[in-house]
A protein has these predicted regions:
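Long, contiguous all-alpha helical interaction modules
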Residues: 1, 147-294
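Mature, well-folded catalytic/scaffold domains that follow N-terminal targeting or propeptide regions
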Residues: 1, 33, 40, 134-137
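Short, small-residue-biased leader/transition segments that mark boundaries at the very start
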Residues: 2-6
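Short helix-coil junctions and helix-kink-helix linkers
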Residues: 8-22
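Short amphipathic alpha-helical interaction segments
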Residues: 18-35, 40-46
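Short, hydrophobic/amphipathic alpha-helical patches that form generic packing surfaces
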Residues: 30-35, 109, 123, 127, ...
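Short, cationic-aromatic polyanion-contact patches
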Residues: 43-68
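Leucine-rich, amphipathic alpha-helical/linker segments
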Residues: 61-141
């Protein structure tokens, strides 16, 4: 029943009572375009054009035993703006939100063929059902990956480690400027800072694989990495403070009396996982028992 859906840690029905930060339609629309299911971003214009085209055609009549709702049917001269799966339109049958064999084939086919998915870890995971996945990022034994993906995963892990050190230092500054110095946070930073210095991470190699919206983000990362490597903590703090002021403006927290540091809720006190938990839940559903409508 629906009660069981709420308890499942799956893509559909997961944490259903939680507040949604982003409009789901925005997220789904982006995903549909990425996987080539939605073939054009101008969806509403395409729907209007399709509707106008269909209404301009002579009315066709079908007998009662003919299929009257076949989304995959090609319309002459009509652009198919969306790729549709095979759907059973007999709504008198019992149905489920679990994936059917046809659903899975449709999803795998689109991920395998989508331009944005070529050379990605997601495509490799979907196409290799035998690949064991761990619950936490990085999630896959690097020895089981081809060289390009192994390096990509390693760089992602290094970027997560690097940003964790930066976030720890941010909280150190925030606690000192907006409340009481958080000694535990300073201890954490000291440990992770030392670990970073001995990790051999080359920030330029890492940034070569990171997609950032603007060059100033990469410049910030390089400046921070240099400060961490040379133990220039005062310069590091200044760099972080300037970055927040430039990006957040009046919404900045450091030095802003409208905010106070709470040691129970530090800012970004976690390592980036690149939404691995969602990927794992999605793949578990894809590999799980197939449902059948009816």
């Amino acid at each position: 029943g629906l009660g069981d859906v709420y308890k499942r840690q799956e893509v559909i029905g997961r944490n259903s009572a939680n507040y949604v930060k982003y409009d789901p339609s925005y997220i789904y629309n982006s995903g549909l375009q990425t996987f080539g299911i939605l073939r054009n971003p101008q969806l509403f214009e395409l729907i209007y054009a399709t509707s106008k085209h269909l209404h301009a055609q002579p009315q066709k009549y079908k007998s009662e035993d003919e299929d009257t709702a076949n989304d995959s049917e090609e319309k002459n001269g009509l652009y198919q703006f969306c790729s549709f799966p095979v759907v059973d339109y007999d709504f008198t049958k019992a149905c489920t939100i679990a994936l059917t064999k046809e659903d899975k084939a449709f999803i795998v086919d689109h991920i395998s063929k989508a331009k944005a998915c070529q050379g990605t870890l997601l495509k490799y995971i979907v196409e290799h059902k035998e690949l064991p996945l761990a619950k936490e990022f990085p999630g896959i034994d690097e020895n089981l990956l081809p060289d390009e993906l192994r390096i990509m995963q390693k760089r992602a892990q290094q970027f997560a480690d690097f940003m964790y050190v930066v976030h720890l230092r941010y909280n150190c500054i925030y606690s000192e400027k907006n409340g009481i110095r958080d000694e535990k946070m300073f201890e954490k930073f000291s440990i992770e800072h030392d670990r970073f210095k001995h990790s051999g991470i080359n920030i330029d190699d890492v940034l070569d694989m990171v997609t950032l919206r603007e060059n100033s983000s990469k410049m910030f990362c390089r400046e921070v990495a240099a400060c961490l490597a040379s133990d220039k903590i005062a310069e590091l703090d200044d760099c972080i403070i300037r970055r927040e002021r430039r990006v957040k403006g009046t919404r900045r927290k450091i030095g802003n009396q409208a905010y106070s540091y709470d040691p129970k809720y530090p800012v970004h006190n976690y390592k980036l996982s690149f939404r691995w938990e969602t990927v794992r839940a999605f793949v578990d559903e894809l590999r799980g028992k197939e449902a059948s409508n009816g």
